[in-house]
Amino acid sequence: MIVDGVHSHPASIALAYRLKGNQSCYLITDAMRAKGMPEGHYDLGGQDVIVKGSEARLSSGALAGSILKMNEGLKNLIQFTGDTIEHLWRVTSLNQAMTLGIDDVKGSIKIGKDADIVIIDDACNVETTIKNGKYHAFK
């Protein structure tokens, strides 16, 4: 699910999560390269994309893609579903790793798995990332 409140209404996301649960939902971003950039005009495959607020649209008004960051998607999912991060974390990583058949090394924290970890604060802001066990300061 692209949980930006633009691609899908918050009530639709809450319904899908209630019906499917945390073991069957996947949080994705489908983000284009304008993600994290200021409002303005960007190119997407030769098409002019206008980024304003949390939306990326073509000049026709059609959605051009997402500019959602994963941590913002998680924050939205918490808000839209009323569930906790203790239940929702797996929709950001483990479910995807299981589908790809790489959950033996990715998707959760366990001895023997790759240490790819994003540390967030209570407001879902990224504080630190760890990639292959190496610390990368975010701020």
Residue locations for each model-derived region?
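Active-site-adjacent C-terminal substructures of enzyme catalytic domains
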Residues: 1-92, 98-103, 120-125
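C-terminal cap of metal-dependent C-N hydrolases
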Residues: 98, 108-139
